[in-house]
């Protein structure tokens, strides 16, 4: 039974990865580790079943204790949060000077605001916005400006241009999945 749950959960994660990459990567890794621990005999079959069910329930309900309450009803915002947090955790190894969750929340809210300003010009979703290269280019520049001016300069987070491109490109990709 645990193998079936794990297999179905893994399939669901693979199918949903584009909508919230950081979230699904995290749970994919947890699932892989659980399967490996069972295969190596480190956990019992009962523990394997319990963990597989726990992971499945969190994946299906899209819940994670790291996600701030204010983003619980904003799917795209949760994805932006995860993308930012993933990068900030990597670049701020000595995170004593930063509240990474707060920075990721600020980033998610700003990215959400910028993207919605472009794709909802008259409070209605722009048709085929994902095919408008100029719009996407301007949107990406605004997000990058925010990351440079606020996250890098104001808060001193040591982001490289590759880090920023990762956040920007992934955020726009996520938006294209949630706002059609």
Specify the residue positions occupied by each region the protein language model found.
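Catalytic cores and motor modules of nucleic-acid processing enzymes
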Residues: 1-180
